[in-house]
């Protein structure tokens, strides 16, 4: 049996304390993001203006990617997949909200532009988060990344062309 020297005990206690603090800080950070997510979802239910709704959904989508990355980092793939599904639904809803406004995105790009910029930024975050997940889940992340890219492309087309159904010569 190995004798416990006072120096070894001290190192063991320090290592245990550091590990405990690290685990606590991860859960506190995640709970803050979840708290913020609930707050934004609450704001969304009270808002009727399409541009304001879209801006709130952009915040929600950013939080969902953050939570998905944290869950993937912690090895909680099922939870990460749920956040990914919520993200997919959120960006689809934001896109649909803006398209239903009937506004000319060429003349009034508010909301359209915000959503397009955020989707472009979020695509790289999705790729990074996908690398943290297991192989099976990476396909789902790639599918959602392509969805974000497609919506972003549609928004650019809508903003640049006066008639989004027309083709540029």
Model-derived regions: residue spans:
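Bacterial N-terminal signal peptides that target proteins for export
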Residues: 3-18
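General helical secondary-structure elements
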Residues: 5-9, 28, 49
């Amino acid at each position: 049996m190995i004798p416990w020297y006072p120096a070894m005990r001290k190192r063991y206690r320090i290592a245990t304390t550091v590990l405990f603090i690290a685990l606590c800080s991860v859960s506190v950070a995640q709970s803050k993001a979840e708290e913020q997510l609930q707050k934004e979802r609450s704001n969304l239910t009270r808002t009727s203006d399409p541009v304001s709704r879209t801006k709130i959904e952009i915040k929600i989508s950013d939080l969902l990617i953050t939570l998905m990355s944290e869950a993937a980092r912690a090895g909680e793939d099922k939870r990460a997949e749920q956040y990914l599904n919520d993200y997919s639904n959120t960006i689809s809803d934001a896109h649909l909200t803006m398209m239903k406004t009937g506004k000319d995105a060429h003349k009034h790009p508010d909301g359209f532009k915000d959503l397009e910029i955020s989707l472009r930024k979020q695509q790289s975050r999705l790729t990074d988060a996908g690398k943290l997940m297991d192989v099976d889940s990476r396909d789902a992340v790639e599918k959602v990344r392509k969805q974000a890219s497609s919506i972003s492309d549609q928004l650019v087309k809508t903003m640049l062309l006066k008639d989004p159904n027309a083709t540029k010569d």
